[in-house]
Amino acid sequence: VAGKTEEVEKFVEFVTNKDFVKKGDEYSIFKNLMPMPEELEGTTSPSKTINKELIEKYGSDNWYDWCYKNWGTKWGDYDTSKSELMKSGSNENESYVHFYYDTAWGPGSDELSILLCNQFPNLNFNLYYEEPGMSFAGQLTINKGEVIGDDNWELHQNNDDISEIEFNK
């Protein structure tokens, strides 16, 4: 995440969980961008009975289907951590910070990318992901509210690690 220091700090504040209980829960990007409806928390999947009211209201009557539909993954981001805020070169007003997190299955939904663009239009995001178990990786680049790159590729046996891949700069 890069941009004017004040804007980067606002993003960090936005994704910081004030009342976290355990290490790894200090930050939550997915849940703060698109919170799961409270009515769906603690529901079972699949639902034992179909709740038409919840389906009409949220598009789903259980947490699992809602998460997959809205976040593109069943748990959102977890074990999320961040680097220190770093200055960008000689410009004292520009900074960046790296966030690291795990998800189940994939990088997150297009809806989350749209929310990043809309809620933080003055920031730049480079989102890198890899799923070595399923042999895929990718990169999404957002520049001041606009998606300017969305690449994905297969990981091959000779590429054991995302650090071996050449990313767009």
Language model feature labels by segment:
Residues 1-169:
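Intrinsic low-complexity, intrinsically disordered or marginally ordered coil/linker segments
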